[in-house]
């Protein structure tokens, strides 16, 4: 299989050809993908916020943002600049250290999770063998920051919001992990690159959504609950808790919570596209299209085109899921806290366990179709 364009290897070899040592070349390479990751995720947040406002306005037969740039595309940037310039206030009776570190613990693990998200064969920051496990481990840190923020605010609404966030995250983390384990079992690997490779070769018919329809639904529901999207936004329910754990926050700290929420939503959509929708793979395999038109797979122009189309396909699949999440906000009413916990513990958890056992049985019975 063509491994695509190795950006890291090409960059390091170029620096070595200029006379730099291999160690120094790697040191110069390391900050570049991380900086690109932060910039791309931030731009993705601005685009998602603008899309949510426009789609929400269309659902309600409104216009939405209109004056800040063409079609209001700069409204999100203007709001972000406003929050950056606002005064940073710490309540007099709050724990200043925990109050400050809480938003950082919410945002940093989400950004670090992008390390294992591939956009192509070699278009990944770090292809660790246990990439999926790393993401699950990082996602378990976020509830600590939410609970810490609610506790440190010394406010009853903030504390209740933090407790709700922790309970919600713990309830849905287990079904989420079990749904991922079923995919890992079929691909025989925890690497996100290997999971996409396992879905290649047969086009849309090889995607995991056909072999794991139940796991796909469980993962997406649990991911929306982890992102605290409606109908699962109980930790910040305005009618009940003012703004939940965000009540006492202002300025940049307040913005970090929203950035973390939207970055997490985009991350969840990207992971769904990688785990269940073939990642960068097209519905019709591009290598077969190249054979039909008689193009050499080693052609550099074809490799560049394939890499660009792979990135586009991954992002399009992710934003299709983001679109469904935005529509759900205006379609499904908010659930009660008891309904939320019942859905996680009494419904999704048993179904995810049964799905894992059925996947194991199918893997033994039909090893060719289920990755035996």
UniProtKB/Swiss-Prot annotation:
Top-level taxon of the source organism: Bacteria
EC number: 7.1.1.-
One Pfam entry name: NADHdh
TM helices/strands, residue ranges: 27-47, 97-117, 128-148, 176-196, 204-224, 254-274, 308-328, 347-367
Keyword Aminoacyl-tRNA synthetase: no
Protein name in UniProt: NAD(P)H-quinone oxidoreductase subunit 1
InterPro entries found in the cross-reference section: NADH_UbQ_OxRdtase_su1/FPO (IPR001694), NADH_UbQ_OxRdtase_su1_CS (IPR018086)
Broad class of enzyme this protein falls into: translocase
